[in-house]
């Protein structure tokens, strides 16, 4: 009934244990087998077991006990560990510390075998072992380069501190600290990357005006550093120190040497003036010395420097300043040249400065074109477009200059390194300035031009240029201060004109005094003194009205010479003097009425400023009218007068209306085309559109027995100016007026014609006043209707009326 269960087949493992990191067990492993079959080696195992059980086995060697340190040495070590030792003192002798080097080599895997140590320890008792020297991992060349750079940076920092350049001194100090850290690491045997070593800088020996020869930098290819160091052989105790290869020296920069030489001359001159008590000249020379520092730094950084603008020697500098200021040359005291300073070398030929406005514009145009081309080469489209606009601006300026048209020089940007544009006429040269680089112009120092109306202005030394003889002017010591700021040519021209006019009156006063005309000389002197306030205003940048300047004496003489002097008998007396007086009185009365009406109009509008303006004008006209009436009454000659053209801007406003009122005036009808013109009775219906399809409707009274009636009726409509829907009504719709003729008994009224008045003109005007043809659809039926529509102010803008008046003005008596 029940079948016997079949044995299951042995399952095979799908995975082996090796892939899980375990030892593979074979499938036929039998734990009971394997030991009984092995007959060899049992006696050896039993003997070993017996030896272990009896304790007769060989005992392991006992480790030697460490020697106990004496108590005195232990106290000394504790005191040394508690003492605060600076890092600099700890790292001074790391290079020759054999213990540390040995530990370093031990860490690197260079420990000696124990057998070698034991073998070396045995003969140590009999004879002293020679000292081994462990070599650092840093090569001798790298260590020598670091030491060499340390000396260079120390000297450069000292020179920078001596010259007062704090920024350069701080920079050299940071490089010196980096070199000191690298030197400590190299002495400790650490690997140093050559790229981490600060670059070499050019220094000059102390006390020598010319810079020392620049030493060539270290080789750019880094020296391959060994990862492991071979054990040092027991050779001599003091190995010879390897010296770094001498770096080839580069020739000195002649520009820096020349500028240093000239700077030392100015320093000596400033010191000489300071000792002699001349502080002003000492400060002047000291400012030039400061400018030299900026340009020397630019030259040392590799920027291009032009020596054409280098100041002259100190002996010629003050003389050049005196020539520019218009002072006498004998007052200039030449500065003594310092004896230790060598004679400066002659400067190389420099590019000639622009002598005319056209050349200056061309040079600036070429500069901006080169910058634009560089930007295009770099694919910097934004910069290229920006400089392209500047190039176009300069090209237009050159075209205008060639065509003789005025050019707005103030709007032209000035590239870095370029001074202000030269004026059209020779102007006083600027104070000598140091050469500037096209990339970074040096900052200018400000000084004061004493004794001149122009006040203080910035001075920078420039190349001395010969100036044409001109009247004494305030010394212009201003040059370009920022990239887009330069002095206005208009201001310079005004300044020059004022000085020339002042000089003319001074000369005229002297000549009048010599001729014995004391009163005339006093008058000219007063005018001469009055120019001081104008000069101060012009030098401060304020505009000056040149039309108010007094006429120079030379032009006065020419003006008087152009008229023929006649006697009273040669002139025919005029018979219409009384008529002229009457016309003058009428004209002044008309002007007075106009001023009063306009004053009242502005008062009704609430314009207080306009009211005051016309009030004052009315007072002036009233005074003139009183003078004319008084002269007529007393029989005196009429005062001198002249006519002027005056422009008045009057805001038109219907002040009798409010802002939310519109007035419709039906004035009259003109020649209606009706069959019975003398018996017709007419009236007008008015319809004005409002919001929400509503409308204002009214009608006039009936005018009987005429076809040209005078209605003269006014209707006021309330409007909403601020409502946009109501504003659209003014734009699209109009006032509808229908003219009716009253019918007889049992007859309805007859429509004569229709008039539509558009309201759109009220957006910009206050009034609509016109006559309109009567229409039947699109056909004219004959006759017209006069209509006027008014609002207080236009819907959108103010209505300003420009009035040109021929104004009668009485001359003031001198």
UniProtKB/Swiss-Prot annotation:
Residues 495-553 are annotated as: DM14 4. Residues 633-772 form the C2 domain. GO terms for cellular component: apicolateral plasma membrane; cell cortex; cytosol; endosome. Residues 256-314 are annotated as: DM14 2. Residues 143-201 are annotated as: DM14 1. Residues 25-47, 86-100, 110-130 have a biased composition (Acidic residues). PANTHER family: COILED-COIL AND C2 DOMAIN-CONTAINING PROTEIN 1-LIKE. This is Coiled-coil and C2 domain-containing protein 1-like. It comes from Drosophila pseudoobscura pseudoobscura (Fruit fly). The lineage of its organism: Eukaryota, Metazoa, Ecdysozoa, Arthropoda, Hexapoda.
């Amino acid at each position: 009934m029940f079948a016997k269960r079949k044995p299951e087949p042995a399952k095979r493992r799908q995975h082996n244990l090796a892939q899980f990191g375990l030892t593979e067990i074979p499938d036929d492993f039998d734990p009971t087998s394997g030991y009984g079959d092995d007959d060899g080696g049992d006696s050896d195992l039993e003997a070993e077991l017996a030896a272990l059980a009896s304790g007769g086995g060989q005992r392991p060697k006992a480790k030697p006990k460490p020697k106990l340190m004496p108590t005195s040495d232990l106290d000394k070590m504790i005191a040394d560990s508690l003492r605060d030792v600076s890092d600099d003192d700890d790292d001074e002798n790391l290079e020759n510390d054999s213990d540390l080097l040995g530990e370093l080599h031990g860490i690197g895997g260079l420990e000696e075998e124990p057998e070698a140590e034991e073998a070396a320890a045995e003969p140590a008792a009999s004879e002293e072992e020679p000292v081994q020297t462990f070599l650092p991992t840093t090569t001798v060349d790298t260590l020598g380069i670091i030491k060499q750079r340390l000396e260079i940076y120390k000297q450069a920092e000292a020179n920078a501190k001596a010259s007062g350049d704090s920024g350069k001194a701080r920079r050299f100090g940071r490089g010196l600290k980096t070199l000191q850290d690298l030197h400590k690491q190299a002495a400790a045997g650490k690997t140093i990357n050559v790229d981490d070593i600060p670059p070499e800088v050019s220094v000059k020996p102390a006390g020598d005006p010319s810079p020392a020869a620049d030493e060539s930098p270290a080789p750019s290819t880094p020296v391959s550093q060994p990862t492991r160091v071979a054990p040092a052989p027991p050779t001599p105790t003091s190995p010879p120190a390897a010296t770094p290869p001498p770096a080839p020296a580069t020739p000195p920069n002649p520009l820096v040497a020349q500028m240093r030489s000239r700077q030392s001359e100015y320093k000596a001159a400033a010191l000489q003036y300071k000792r002699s008590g001349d502080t002003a000249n000492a400060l002047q020379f000291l400012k030039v010395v400061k400018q030299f520092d900026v340009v020397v730094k630019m030259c040392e950084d590799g920027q291009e420097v032009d020596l054409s603008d280098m100041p002259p020697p100190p002996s010629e500098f003050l003389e050049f300043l005196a020539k520019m200021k218009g002072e006498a040359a004998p007052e200039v005291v030449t500065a003594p040249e310092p004896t230790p300073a060598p004679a400066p070398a002659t400067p190389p030929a420099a590019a000639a400065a622009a002598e005319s406005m056209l050349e200056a514009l061309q040079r600036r145009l070429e500069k901006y074109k080169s910058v634009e081309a560089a930007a295009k080469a770099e694919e910097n489209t934004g910069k290229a477009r920006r400089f392209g606009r500047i190039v176009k601006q300069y090209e237009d300026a050159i075209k205008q200059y060639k065509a003789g048209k005025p050019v707005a020089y103030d709007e032209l940007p000035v590239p870095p390194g370029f001074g202000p544009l030269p004026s059209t006429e020779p102007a006083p040269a600027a104070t000598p300035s140091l050469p500037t680089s096209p990339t970074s112009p040096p900052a200018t120092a400000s000084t004061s031009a004493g004794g001149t109306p122009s006040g203080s202005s910035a001075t920078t030394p420039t190349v001395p240029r010969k100036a044409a003889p001109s009247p004494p002017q305030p010394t212009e010591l201003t040059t370009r201060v920022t990239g887009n700021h330069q002095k206005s040519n208009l201001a310079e021209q005004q300044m020059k004109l004022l000085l020339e006019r002042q000089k003319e009156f001074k000369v005229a006063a002297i000549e009048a005094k010599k001729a014995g005309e004391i009163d005339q000389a006093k008058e000219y002197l007063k005018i001469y003194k009055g120019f001081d306030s104008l000069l101060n205003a012009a030098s401060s940048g304020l505009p000056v009205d040149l039309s108010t300047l007094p006429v120079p004496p030379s032009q006065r003489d020419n003006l008087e010479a152009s008229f023929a002097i006649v006697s009273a008998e040669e002139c025919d007396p005029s018979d219409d003097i009384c008529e002229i007086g009457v016309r003058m009185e009428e004209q002044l009365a008309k002007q007075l009425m106009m001023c009063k009406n306009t004053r009242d109009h502005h008062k009704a509008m609430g314009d207080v400023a306009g009211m005051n303006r016309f009030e004052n004008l009315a007072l002036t006209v009233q005074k003139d009218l009183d003078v004319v009436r008084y002269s007529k009454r007393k029989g005196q000659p009429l005062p001198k007068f002249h006519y002027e053209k005056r422009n008045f801007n009057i805001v038109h406003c219907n002040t009798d209306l409010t802002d939310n009122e519109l007035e419709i005036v039906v004035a009259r009808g003109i020649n209606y085309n009706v069959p019975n013109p003398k018996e017709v009775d007419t009236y007008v219906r008015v319809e004005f559109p409002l919001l929400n399809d509503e409308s204002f409707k009214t009608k006039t009274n009936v005018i009987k027995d005429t076809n040209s009636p005078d209605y003269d009726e006014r209707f006021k409509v309330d409007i909403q100016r601020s409502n946009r829907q109501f504003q659209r009504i003014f734009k699209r719709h109009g006032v509808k007026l229908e003219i009716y003729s009253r019918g007889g008994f049992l007859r309805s009224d007859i429509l004569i014609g229709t008039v539509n008045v558009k309201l759109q003109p009220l957006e910009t005007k206050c009034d609509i006043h016109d006559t309109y043809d009567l229409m039947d659809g699109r056909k004219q039926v004959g006759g017209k209707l006069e209509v006027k529509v008014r609002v207080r102010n236009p819907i959108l803008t103010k209505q300003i009326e420009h009035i040109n008046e021929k104004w009668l003005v009485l001359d003031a008596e001198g």
